[in-house]
Amino acid sequence: TGSGPSLSIVNPLDVLRQRLLLEIARRRMRQSQDQIQANREILQTI
């Protein structure tokens, strides 16, 4: 049971890090999708 407290301290940090990485990945996906959309619009006007 000695590892219980340390686990409860470490886990939230891992969860926070995971959420941060997911958020960064989502933002990158959104940016790339916006870029693709912008490129399509540019190609259509040419």
Swiss-Prot record:
N-terminal signal peptide: none
Record keywords, A-Z: Amidation, Hormone, Secreted
Intrachain disulfide bonds: none
Name of the featured protein: Diuretic hormone
Secreted is among the record's keywords: yes
Modified residues (Isoleucine amide): I46
Protein family according to the UniProt entry: Belongs to the sauvagine/corticotropin-releasing factor/urotensin I family.
Known role: Regulation of fluid secretion. Stimulates primary urine secretion by Malpighian tubules and causes a dose-dependent stimulation of cAMP levels in the tubules.
GO cellular component term, pick one: extracellular region
